[in-house]
Every structure is written in structure tokens, then in C-alpha cells.
């Protein structure tokens, strides 16, 4: 890391910085009064040294599993479970919902957000319920959908993959029961004391868990740029929930500042509630009853319940994150407690572990893909590919894929849908889902040969050993999954590998870009490009600020007006351009400037002018009246391209499937592009189908409605498809609706009717990264230009080939076939010429020959080495040359090869000037050639000097040198 680069702290490091201060001041940071009200007292855990609150002095440790040493509820249950009442996964959610909806301060239940966090520029997936409301609800810029609210939010976390199937409590995808409260200065709801009270009432009244069984640990929470004290509550050695009180905004270096909005964020693992109540061996039995039953039935797998029963209470100790490199010793210790050897224990639970792992990973994948993410090698989506390939590897190892096949795997996904529906709602029909899984399976079976070569090269470099960072490199860059690496290298997968990968991604997130202009004190610029979309001239607007351009040596060429009809670069749409006029000094006539760029900073619109403002006093310009105009032709074309982007997006989703989401877009005057999520490249037929569908929408002449809607109402009515183009951080959204086709929250400029666009043409498409395609297209006037260019090509070919347009394809095929036939004849003749020439040379008495040729270089490389043995035995040398190349085999020991090389390469100074030239000299000299003898499979090495050179050759100097050294010109 260079000195200029800021150090980016992880959430763990930020928490560590804050903990000492929080511990010293419990009354300041923690709700001590409500603890005392419920009869809890503060104590310090002798095992971990953390402070906690207990209801009975008989409780000596904090309640964390690592301190208790086992899950004490297994086989016993607690609360209503201990009284014989079984609690289901769905039932646990209902108890929570009932308790908080009927609390003293009633909570509103909201629907879950998609697990793909398209409203967040800094994360890819929702890892906690609060992610749905960061940063804008937390900062107060936007109102939450309800306040206070509760939800069951599906989350993805990939830092615990090492623990899944073992500890009983870890998942890659899970439902987090959430309580979120947003206390603004002008509207207080409730904070720490009430939060603890409501949670304890749910535990004791609905679940009937005794207070003596509950412990509350003081902790620190950090995430999503926020920080605050938190209270974790435990029952029977299991953490059930965490009450976070957000009080601070954190910076990447660990410093913090108070938040204006005080936020409560409660996160409870829904999967843990039925487990602790029922006292099951593992939570997976309570969460995946249908999936486990189906998988066992299809694969005939057998769980060793005897060993699992012995192991389950102690499984809490195997959290890799907390084991700190002592995983092997912990396994030894648990095995001893179970009266087993470590090998017997590992083997005894291995089938169960793999069943749980497959059920967990497939459920996480189901929700992620249903919500619009695709497995890939890029960014966070590489985690999806990782867990999918991990699933394939486990199933292959066990022989399960052979038994259940792809049909069986789809049945497993269906079980998850059935189990999740009561909480998350019904899943929509998703025709392309199976195709996505099948393609990933084929890719896994045929692991990229290049990836294996890279691994082999790395392994040789590291002398057969891979450090943790090497494993991460192979997974994140080479596209290999851990099981493949282990299989190919014979190395053991590091115990905490998945945690390290997650940590790697967290550290890879760059800090936000620096804000060059502090403009929060200014009133928001009144934006008129939407309400007056067809207004291109203005006058009477006033300057409110003049700025020096920080990127152009403080050049005074930026103005901010009180109103603006100029559209700033935003949402992928390029800015308007135009002209403005104003008096630069009092008493002077207005001066005209070109507006060359328009940007939005906070709530202000910055106009960048083509030259510096010649004013004596910049402050005197405040209040100066400005007139101007927007480039109408550019605005119109950008408007066409922006609306066409919406149409292409909707058309791609209709043709390819519901997994298609916009991943980015750019609309310029010349052309537009849209990036979409898709698992394979587009065929010509698919491109045409999307283009045809887009033009069908145009021909229908659909109305494009543009209107404002309250954010809560818009999300409730349309869902998160609104945010195809990204989040709009406003309480009121501008909705752009193409009737019956597409609906998005969008602030860009758009046509009033699809018919205004006239025509859309797709130029081409390409894969820009794994799982993401880029489609280039043009609309309106640019589409007509593109069509005319195609027509010109057809006309030119028709004229040159003297055939009607309909016969161009057949004529081209005929020409190409003739060309291939002639090329083959030329190749055959070239080979014959070379062989005849060399055979003739072999019969000559002279030893050294040079031969000027106009044949292609590749013919010499392919054919001359066949004569290497004969040339060596007869001590003959032969060099072929032309203006573009030199190739030869040399046996002459008296020839000064270094001098020949110097002549070919030339003066180093000249060579330096040629560095960027396409004809720069390249010279290669080897002391052997590889030849494949007739009838043999393997090549053999023949010791003979081989020289080759490419580039603009100095043939006269080379020829002169060789002739002076006894070479004879052979014609």
C-alpha cells in the first residue's frame, strides 16, 4: 500500500477500536435501567472477560457457546418446547409478528426486500435487515416504509461457509427477524430501554422462556458505515438475537461522528428459534424438514444419528472464526468427550454435514437467483458460483448427482420454495432457472483448462505449497472452487478459508470518492428539465455560486444557478450542452460561454463553462441574471436513447427470462448501451428477437407516463423492479412508465410516446464479465444512420460482385470457397517449393546458403525443421529471408551469431524509436528445434541453432554480412 492510499479498516477492526470506551461507560452506552427493572445484574465473564447481564447469580458465564462449552438445550428444549409444544419455522415467525404488532408501541410488518441490494452502490447482497435502509433512511434523507417496523428479511453471508453443516447454527442464506426504529430529532419513537423490554416480552410471554435461562452480553456492532452499542441475548449457549443501537457514522479509518437519526436495528436468526425451543439435534432439521427428507429419499443417504446425538451439544465449539487456528485440537477434544477417535467422529457426522450443506447452499442459491443474481467469477457473485460448485463437488463425491440427476436437484429447489412460501410468499414461475443451474454444472464439469494451467504454474512457483492468499487468488481470479483446488493439488483446504475470502472482499471495497465541492449549505437547484422537458431557452435565472475547477488548476469556470433546464450526467445519461450568457463584471455587456459539462453535487447543479470567467470579483457575480439555451438536437437524441434503454431492458427480460436485470447503462448522443445479467452470450437469433420486440413496442405507440409518487406507495405498488437503473435517494420518486411494458424510478429525459423513437437497431452484444452482457444499440436518427450504412454495404457488394442483393450471400460463399481452394493450392505449392529447395541444397557441395523468398513465414517454421537432422549431419546452414522476416537453421561454428543479431536488431537508439511501431524488430535464437519423427507420437530435440526475426528487415546489410562469411545465394 502506498502512503497516498487511505487505510481501509474492516468492521472487526472498527469494533475493536470502540470497545474499551463502551465497557468503561455502561450507563452511557447501554440500557442499564431496563436490565435492573427485569431483575438482571451486571457481571464479568471469567472465560471471555466480556460484561454481561444475568437474572440469577448461579449463572457464572456470559452464555456464549464458547464460554458455556456446549448447547444445553439440545434434547431438552426450552419454554413452550419443554412443555411438549413443537414450534415450526413458520410458527416462530408468527410468534414474533404477534408480539411486536401488539406491543405497547405497535410495529408494522413490511414485506422483505430482494436479497440483491440494487439500491446500494457499496454492497451486492443484503447481509442484514438494516441494509435495506442504509444509507438514506439512517441519514434521514429518506423515510422508511414504516416506523417502527418488523420484517423477515432473507440475507446472504459467505464468511461462515466453513461452519455450515457442523455448528448447527450457521447458514449462507437465512431469514433475519428484524426490528427497525428511526428516531429523528423532530420525531422520537423509542430507543434502548423500550427495545430491550419488547424483546424480553416476546421471549418470556410468547415463547415462555424463563428469565434465568436468558443472558444479555454487552457488545459493539459495526456495519454498512454505522456503529453503536449492542446487546446480544443468549439461551442455552446459543445467541438468538442482537439489539443494535446505531449512534455513529464511521469512516474508513475508524473515526466516527454522531448520527442525527438514532436507529435501532434488531437482528434475530429465525432459524435458531424453533431449534432452541424444540431442542433438536441441529437447526437444520427444523428449517429443512422437506428438503432433508427429499434428499435422503433420492440419494439413499444414511445419517448416523447415534454419533450425531453425541456430537451435537459440542458442535458449538467449532466456529472457525472463534477457534483461532485450533480447529484440529477442538475436534480431538470433542471426540474424546464422545468416546470416539477423531477419525470416527469426522466420518460419523460427514454424511449429515454434507446433507445440511447441500440444503443450505441450494436454498441460498434459489433466493439469490430468483431475486436476479447470477453465479459468476466477478465480485460478490463469485460467492454464488463458489457455493454452487461446492454443492456439485459434495454431490459428486457422494455419488448423489448420479442418483438424483438434474431433475432431482430441481425437486430439492422446489422443497425450499414450499418451505419458504409461508414466510416469503409464493415464488414466481422461473423458466430460465433450470438453464442457469445446468450451464453452471457443465462449466464445473469442464473446468477451464487455462485455470488448471495457472494453478499448475502457481504450484510450481510456490514449490508445491499454497499460502492462504494463494487459495484466495485461485478462487477469485482463476475461477476454481476450493474442492477442485484440493483435488488437483492434494492439499488440505484451510480451516478458515471462506472467512478469509469474505474478509478479502470486504477489504476490496474502495472508499467513496472524495467530494471536491462542499455545497450542503446551498439551497437545492430547482430542476426544470423534467417539468419543462421541451423548453430549450431560458432567461432570468440567477447565479448562486461560482466555483474554481479543482480538476483544472482552480480555473474559474463553474457556475451554479438557482434553476436549471440543463440535465446533469446521471443514471447513465450524458449531460446536456448548450450556451449561457451573463455579465462578468458590473457595467459590462453579457459574455457568451459554451456549457461543456453538467454535473450534480449534493442538491446543486454545476455548469462547467468552456473558458475561464474573466471577473475581477467572483463574489460579485452572485445574483447576476443569466440567459441561455440547451442544445436541442443533442437533448432530443439523448431522450430517444434513454427511453430506448428502458425498452431494450424490458424486451431482453421478455425474450431471455426474468433473471435479466439492468446492470448498468450509458446513453450518449452517438449510441447507447445497456448491461444486463445473463448466463451466456447472445446468439444472432436472440439479438434479433430482442430488437424485434423493441420495435414492436415502438410500433404500438405506447404512452410514456411520467409522474411523481411517494416512495412507500411506489414500492408497495410496483416492487423493487423500480430500481433497475439504481436507487433514487428521495422520498418522492419520479416514475417513468411505458404502458404495459416497463416501469422504473428514473429522473432522465424521455419521450412522450414510444412511436416518437421511430426505430431501434442493435449494433452488437458482447460478454463484458462473467454473467453480464453489454448490448450496444442506436435509436431514432442514429438508428436510421446505422440502417443506411448497412444498406450502403449491401449496395457496394451488389455493384462490385455484379449480382442482385438477394444473391450476395450465395455469391460471397462461392467467392470464399474459391479462395479457400486457391489458398490450399498455394499452401501445397509453397511446401513443395521449400522441400525442393532444401533437397537441392542438401545435394550441393557448398555448406552455407541464403535464399530470398516471397513465401509466408509460417511455411518455413512448419517445414524446414523436418530437415534439421540432415542439415546437422551434413554440416549445412540455410537462411531464408524477406523484407518482413528471417528464418534459418545454422551449423556453421565460425559464423558470429552475436554480430548477426546486432545487424538484425540494429542501433539500440533506433530500436527505442521503433518501440511503438507495428514493424519493430523481434529476434529469437534457440540452440535446438523440436521435431516429430514420422510414425512417432512425441517430438524429439535436435541440437542445431535456430534463428527467427520479424519486422522490417535490413536485408542488404544482412545479405552483405552473410556473403562475406561464406554464404552462397541460392535461387
Model regions and ranges:
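Cysteine-rich micro-motifs
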Residues: 56-70
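Intrinsically disordered, low-structural-confidence terminal and linker regions
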Residues: 1-24
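A glycine- and charged-residue-rich anion-binding loop/surface
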Residues: 17-31, 37, 41-42, 49, ...
